[in-house]
Design a protein with these regions (language model features):
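Substrate-recognition "cap/lid" segment bordering the active-site pocket of phosphatases
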Residues: 95-147, 178
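Short amphipathic alpha-helix with an adjacent loop that forms part of the alpha/beta core around
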Residues: 194-199
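Alpha-helical segments flanking ligand/cofactor-binding loops in enzyme cores
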Residues: 78, 138, 157-158
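Short, acidic/turn-prone active-site loops that include or flank metal/cofactor-
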Residues: 111-116, 171-175, 189-191
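Acidic, Mg2+-coordinating phosphoryl-transfer loop and its flanking beta/alpha structural elements
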Residues: 86-91, 145-186
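Short, well-ordered alpha-helical microsegments
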Residues: 94-98, 156-157, 192
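Short loop/turn microsegments at loop-to-beta-strand junctions
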Residues: 1-2, 150
Length: 199
């Protein structure tokens, strides 16, 4: 049995932190896992900047409410979900993902959660498990699933390499150059065809 595991940001929706960086006028928040592979380091740094500027969950959610899925993402996901089982694996947080999942037709997402004070300040975050994407893929494999994975970033390489088929999608030139063995696509139709061929 097959199950497709997709990254969310950069694959199905724009990068939330880049959108928030532009909305808030804080260029430092543009850094993502494409730039910093150590997610804990990246999140600790982000939370420090939010605190410094007095920004909390509400401000980020206001930005997320204005974000639409990437053009073609919902049609791609609809067709893929009609063909096989799909789970979105993301390092994002439930508090960020919900409005985006609604716009994508409520696919299943495995992600993390934020710790938020009563005043809306984001005080920390709770990862579902260590190396959550790779741990999830290995768990799915342990219960009889063959995984097919796609993502755009450093933190997707583990699931791509551990799966029976894996693809980079809308990735950086650096990651593509470092991993020429991984097929890379820019268009949803091409990714859909590659996934269907791997089923």
């Amino acid at each position: 049995m097959n199950i497709v595991c997709l990254d969310m940001e950069g694959v199905l929706v724009p990068e939330i932190w880049i959108a928030f960086s532009e909305a808030s006028g804080i260029p430092e928040l543009r850094r993502t896992t494409r730039d910093e592979p150590d997610y804990d380091k990246l999140m600790t740094w982000r939370l420090g900047i939010l605190k410094e500027h007095g920004l909390g969950l509400k401000e980020i959610q206001d930005t997320i409410a204005k974000i639409d899925p990437l053009p073609g993402a919902k049609a791609f996901l609809d067709e893929l979900r009609a063909t096989t089982q799909v789970i979105i694996l993301s390092d994002t947080f439930e508090e960020f993902a919900k409005p985006l999942m609604e716009k994508l037709g409520w696919p299943t997402i495995f992600c993390n959660s934020l710790e938020v004070a009563e005043n809306g300040e984001i005080t920390g975050y709770k990862m579902r498990c260590e190396k959550s994407k790779l741990t999830t893929v290995k768990a799915l494999q342990s219960i009889g699933y063959d995984t097919i994975a796609s993502g755009d970033s450093f933190n997707d390489l583990g699931i791509i390499q551990a799966s029976k088929a894996g693809f980079l999608f809308k990735s950086t030139e650096q990651i593509k150059a470092d991993h020429p063995e991984i097929p890379a696509f820019e268009e949803f139709d091409d990714l859909l065809a590659a996934i269907k061929a791997a089923l």
